[in-house]
């Protein structure tokens, strides 16, 4: 005979949800910070190819 599984408590569900949301918030903050540094030209971790005009 089929027996229903034990139900997990709401506090465990809420804790998992909070951890997941926290990780997403940290990732979003890093992405915004990286975008700001690239836009202002202060990014240290990127190497951009410099396009030089050739004079003939």
Curated annotation (Swiss-Prot):
InterPro entries given in the database record: Ribosomal_bL32, Ribosomal_bL32_plant/cyanobact, Ribosomal_zn-bd
MF terms in GO: structural constituent of ribosome
Cellular component annotations (GO), alphabetically ordered: large ribosomal subunit
A single BP term in Gene Ontology: translation
Family: Belongs to the bacterial ribosomal protein bL32 family.
HAMAP family in the cross-refs: Ribosomal_bL32
Protein known as: Large ribosomal subunit protein bL32
Gene: rpmF
